[in-house]
Amino acid sequence: MRTVFIVSDGTGITAETFSHSILAQFEMRFRKVRMPFVDTPDKAHVAVGKINEAFYNEGVPPIVFTTLVNAESNKAIRRAKAMILDMFQTFIEPLEKELGLKSTHAIGRFHQNADTEAYKNRIEAINFSLAHDDGQSHKNLEDADVILVGVSRSGKTPTSLYLAMQYGLKAANYPLIPDDFERGRLPSALYAYKQKIFGLSIDPQRLTEIRNERRPGSKYAAVENCRYEVNEAESMMRREGIKWLSSTHKSIEEIATTILQEIKVDRDNY
């Protein structure tokens, strides 16, 4: 198992996201060590000490993902006995040449920009999604950017919160239940906002596994019931002309990206 250090002068979210995408391409395990707020040369030297310690203990160079903007800190990290993947320098220096413009080299610039109207929008979106989780409220649905529907435990809540936190989208979600299937139509409260609705489905076998973790041995979790609910929900969405996807083999990120493409909402990524 190789050790991976994620070194940043801020929260490290950017570096960690990038490292996850890169390392996922390799079928091996990595031990991740997160080192946020390395925002001075002194802290960089401390980081180098820990990186070198891993090298001597393991006998192989650690892999280091960095997003440091301070030149002195960068110099210090580059002296470490490791493979250095400097994300900012890889992209910023070529862009400076192409644009004929020096970058600000400001620590946390991205997150400083977010502390404005966009940040306020994101907080409002999170509060909205929490208030409209699992059909808790029908109020202000006209303000929703998207309304997710699907059977219980098909991934609606985590997807709604991801859309709110990552994109500032006001995402409501509503469970489709046996009463809806008996009527053969969407809940009446949703019809006025049909253009905002997107459906989630799931493989019945996977659904019964998830539900058994919550209510083991119950009718709610029985595979026959799960198969019935999924079939009815999918039939309803087809009849109503609602776009939908199966969440069975998709990550939250993949589901959210598909929803953004299909619903055609326009919000900034944080």
From Swiss-Prot:
Pfam name, any one: Kinase-PPPase
Residues at which ADP binds: G150, V151, S152, R153, S154, G155, K156, T157
Enzyme Commission designation: 2.7.11.33, 2.7.4.28
InterPro entries: Kinase-pyrophosphorylase, PSRP
Span of the signal peptide: none
EC primary class: transferase
GO molecular function, one term: ATP binding
Keywords: Kinase, Nucleotide-binding, Serine/threonine-protein kinase, Transferase
Catalytic activity reported: [pyruvate, water dikinase] + ADP = [pyruvate, water dikinase]-phosphate + AMP + H(+); [pyruvate, water dikinase]-phosphate + phosphate + H(+) = [pyruvate, water dikinase] + diphosphate
Family: Belongs to the pyruvate, phosphate/water dikinase regulatory protein family. PSRP subfamily.
Cited PANTHER family: PYRUVATE, PHOSPHATE DIKINASE REGULATORY PROTEIN 1, CHLOROPLASTIC
Xref: HAMAP family: PSRP
Task performed by this protein: Bifunctional serine/threonine kinase and phosphorylase involved in the regulation of the phosphoenolpyruvate synthase (PEPS) by catalyzing its phosphorylation/dephosphorylation.
Protein name: Putative phosphoenolpyruvate synthase regulatory protein
